[in-house]
Amino acid sequence: SAMAAEFGRLDPVPAVVTPVYRLKSETIHNPAVVKTLLAHDGRALYFSRSAIPHVRDVDPSEWHQHTSYWGHVGMYGFRGDVLTIWDQLPASPLEDLERLEQLRLIEAGYTIATFVVEGTSLSVDTPEQLEEARLLAGAA
């Protein structure tokens, strides 16, 4: 799998790997779409429901013209030892604020590596997304 290949490519082996995809301009301000802020080496610096980074002195409708925005697919590949300690880590204030479980690892100092995939997956986290999924299922 792509996640297993990423574990083998990286040295040192990260705690977690997860796929990201390039966001379209119409989705960067949607709080139901989780955004990922990436370092130059592909490490996830932060995950948020807000558009990150914020582009100062530019109308938000034009932010996508100044930087790339990355969406989080929501699948993970974990190093074995990380799975065993996950529930022992203290609850994270950022995790509670954003309602994003991966922030617990970020705040605890663990590395989350990313790799780019084409397209996106369908998330069903809101009533609106459930309706969209029902429409897509009916069209299939």
Name these PLM-found stretches:
Residues 1-89:
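Conserved core of the sugar-phosphate nucleotidyltransferase
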Residues 63-140:
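Conserved alpha/beta core of the MobA/IspD/sugar-nucleotide pyrophosphorylase nucleotidyltransferase superfamily
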